[in-house]
UniProtKB/Swiss-Prot annotation:
GO terms for biological process: antibiotic biosynthetic process. Signal peptide: none annotated. The active site is at 8 (nucleophile), 10 (proton donor). Its EC number is 3.1.3.101. This is Validoxylamine A 7'-phosphate phosphatase. Pfam families: HAD_2. It is an enzyme of class 3 (hydrolase). A divalent metal cation binds at residues 8, 10, 165. One of its GO terms (molecular function) is metal ion binding. Belongs to the HAD-like hydrolase superfamily. CbbY/CbbZ/Gph/YieH family. NCBIfam families: HAD-SF-IA-v3. Its cofactor is Mg(2+); Mn(2+); Co(2+). Keywords: Antibiotic biosynthesis, Cobalt, Hydrolase, Magnesium, Manganese, Metal-binding. The gene is vldH.
Length: 213
């Protein structure tokens, strides 16, 4: 039986991918840089600066920091799509807390964003650990975030389970040696093929019977 449950944030507990993708799309349009859906998907589940570094050469005369600040400004505009709670998220968190299962979130977002989003969700006070982009030197798909969470909760990776919606996050969990449940909330099943189990969303979780016994 798993001793701790670790969750990604965006796309796993809250669905802000429409908002995030529109912010990145506005950046590309504003600078006249061609893009398609695969480009926008490449930002999902990764720290903004690391993902932007893959494309900064197309934005002549601009730094990664400048471009990420511009994206953040777009994301804060009132006309952007609103973030919504993923189905089953709060119900599962409350269930696990009542069962005394330690909970953690490992996100590619900065701490101020994560704490604000989790407070709005009503989940921040339920967590035993929160690992953000500010707490690691390498973001997903590097396993550092999930390994750090396991260390903070004093468990071995084999004693944890991760819930993720993005390929980068699934790779991070697997590289950390953790059983990973992929949620098809933002990507299709083919994109999440590295996950150990695939579910539609968190309403399909039947704790603790997930994966091998």
């Amino acid at each position: 039986m798993y001793k701790v449950a670790l969750f990604d944030l965006d796309g796993t507990l809250i669905n802000s991918e429409h908002k995030n993708r529109e912010a990145w799309a506005r950046l590309f349009r504003r600078h006249g840089v061609p893009y398609d859906d695969s480009v926008l998907r490449s930002f999902t589940g990764r720290p903004a600066k690391e993902a932007m570094a893959d494309h900064v050469a197309s934005f002549a005369g601009h730094s990664v920091d400048e471009l990420c600040a511009e994206v953040a400004a777009y994301a804060a505009l009132p006309d952007m799509p609103a973030a919504v709670t993923v189905d089953g998220a709060m119900e599962l968190l409350h269930q696990l807390q009542q069962m005394r299962v330690p909970l953690g979130v490992v996100t590619s977002g900065p701490r101020d964003y994560a704490e604000s989003a989790l407070t709005t969700l009503g989940a921040l006070q339920l967590l035993d650990v929160l690992i953000t982009a500010d707490d690691v030197s390498r973001g997903k798909p590097d396993p550092e975030g999930y390994s750090t969470a396991c260390s903070a909760l004093n468990v071995e990776p084999s004693q944890a389970i991760v819930f993720e919606d993005a390929p980068a996050g699934i790779l991070a969990a697997k590289r950390a040696g953790i059983f990973c449940v992929g949620l098809t909330t933002t990507h299709d099943a083919e994109a999440l093929a590295e996950a150990d189990v695939l579910l539609k969303d968190l309403t399909e979780v039947r704790w603790p019977h997930i994966g091998p016994s």
